[in-house]
Amino acid sequence: MKALLLSLLFFLSVGKLLGQQPYYKYGETTHGKKTSYHVSQDSLFVIMEKIEGHPIMKPVRLQNINNKHDLFDNKKFQRKNGRMLLEYPMTTAEIVYRHLKQEMEELVDAKLTIFIHMLANRQGDIVEISFLIWDHPAWQAIPPDTFYMIEQEIKKKIKLADPESFNEDYIYAVTDISFFGTQKELLEEEKKMKELSKEFYIYEQNRRKMREKRESRK
């Protein structure tokens, strides 16, 4: 009986997702109440999916058409892998999980990932964001206003670490949030990452104070 109920819940969930009209179609602009996103394709991540052994799904890139800078397409920024983010008192994963709380079950069942591409200015403020998701019903059912709220909260609460070490006006960073494991496991892992983020935040604050102190002596 229990197995029958679980199967019924699964098919109802899948049916609900498949019955919804997809928000994101290649080459089109999808409109929300607060903003609109242009939808394009990035073929790079198809290879990554094959390597990871997950079902091959086309990647969907969402870019806010109301961005003030339009730097992603013009490539007027310094791209360097491994740029650290200041994620305290709130982490990027915490922001994403909170806004996608209602969709967590479907995202976890499908073992999906979201890539968040960011541009920061010389002060470390995040000024432009684009999302990379998979062409999967669980993502397709999420309205653009949800991504907009994630984008706005990231801009308010996340900063780039040590932006002064770059010569360019804008610096690129990327992070990914995965939905691998149970919801409980994801939240427990996020708490551990938050503690590490706190330690790094304190380290970065102390390093900045020491540098300012050295510069004041010159």
Cite the ranges covered by each PLM segment.
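Bacterial Sec-dependent N-terminal signal peptides
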Residues: 1-26, 218
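Charge-biased low-complexity segments
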Residues: 20-218
